Amino acid sequence: MDVRQSIHSAHAKTLDTQGLHNEFLVEKVFVADEYTMVYSHIDRIIVGGIMPITKTVSVGGEVGKQLGVSYFLERRELGVINIGGAGTITVDGQCYEIGHRDALYVGKGAKEVVFASIDTAIYYNCAPAHTTYPTKKVTPDEVSPVTLGDNLTSNRRTINKYFVPDVLETCQLSMGLTELAPGNLWNTMPCHTHERRMEVYFYFNMDDDACVFHMMGQPQETRHIVMHNEQAVISPSWSIHSGVGTKAYTFIWGMVGENQVFDDMDHVAVKDLR
C-alpha cells in the first residue's frame, strides 16, 4: 500500500516536477495478476487497479490488517469500472458478470471480493462508509449521461454518471466516466474546485505517443502534471482539475466528501486563472 499524506496548498506550489509526482501522481495503476493500492489521507480515499490475467485476484483480510480492521470493506464502500474485457467479480459468493465499461458498487460489510478474467482491467475507488447499501451492477445503458462543451472550444465531451444519487445510493463515493469526442482536447474548462470534496482522475484510452497536460493547483497558482495512458492523479479540494491532451482521451473521475450533489462546484472563470 502506497500512503500519500495530505498537503497544504502553500507547500504544493513550491514543488518541482518530481515533487508534484510524488504527492499527486499514481504512475502505475495496473499490474498483471495483482491489485495496486494508493491510500490518500485526503478524505481517506483508496484508488488502484485490479488485473486478473492468469489467476484470480482477491481483496480481503490481508488488506484489512493494513487498515486496522478485520477485512477490506468492514468500514468501506467500493466502486469499480471495467475498462478491459469481460470478467467476473464474486462478492461473498455472489457472482457478477462484468463487461467492458460495466461498473459494480460493493456496499460496506462485504468480506471477500474476488476478481477473475483473462483480459479485464478494473479501476477502483474506495471510501469510508457509515452504513451498508446493496451491491449493484451498473451498465453503460443505466448511467446518467450528459453531453457538454463545443467543438469550437475543443471540449465536446459526454459525462457518464455511474455512481450518483440519481442512479444508486452510496455513502459518499461518486464515480463516472467522461469521454471526449474525436478531435476534442480539453476537459473541465472552464474549471472549478470543490470545497466540500476531493477528486481523483484516471486517464486512459490514450495512444502511446499521446499525453494529457493535467492542470492543478489553486486558480492563481496553477501547475501541471504530464499524464500518460492509465495513470491517475489526486486532486485536493483546493485544486483545480482540468486537462488538455495531444489527442482525445477518456477519464474516470471519483469524488469523496460531504456532498454528493454533482453541481456543487466553485467555478473559476478562465480570465481569473494564473
Curated annotation (Swiss-Prot):
Q: Which UniProt keywords apply?
A: Isomerase, Metal-binding, Zinc
Catalytic activity annotated for this protein? 5-dehydro-4-deoxy-D-glucuronate = 3-deoxy-D-glycero-2,5-hexodiulosonate
The domain of life is: Bacteria
Q: Which residues take part in binding Zn(2+)? A: H192, H194, E199, H241
EC class of this enzyme? isomerase
Task: Please name the pathway.
Answer: Glycan metabolism; pectin degradation; 2-dehydro-3-deoxy-D-gluconate from pectin: step 4/5
Q: EC no.? A: 5.3.1.17
- On whether Hydrolase is a keyword of this UniProt record, the answer is no
Query: Per its UniProt record, what CDD domains does this chain match?
Result: cupin_KduI_C, cupin_KduI_N
Single GO biological process annotation from the record:
D-galacturonate catabolic process
Q: Which SUPFAM superfamilies match?
A: RmlC-like cupins
- Cofactor dependence: Zn(2+)
For this chain's record, the cofactor binding note is: Binds 1 zinc ion per subunit.
Pfam families, alphabetically? Answer: KduI (PF04962)
Q: Which GO terms describe its molecular function?
A: 4-deoxy-L-threo-5-hexosulose-uronate ketol-isomerase activity; zinc ion binding
The free-text function statement in the UniProt record for this protein reads: Catalyzes the isomerization of 5-dehydro-4-deoxy-D-glucuronate to 3-deoxy-D-glycero-2,5-hexodiulosonate.
Q: Name the protein family.
A: Belongs to the KduI family.
Q: Which NCBIfam families match?
A: PRK00924.1
Q: PANTHER family of this UniProt entry?
A: 4-DEOXY-L-THREO-5-HEXOSULOSE-URONATE KETOL-ISOMERASE
By what name is this protein known?
4-deoxy-L-threo-5-hexosulose-uronate ketol-isomerase
- Organism (species): Shigella boydii serotype 18 (strain CDC 3083-94 / BS512)
Highest classification ranks of the organism? Bacteria, Pseudomonadati, Pseudomonadota, Gammaproteobacteria, Enterobacterales
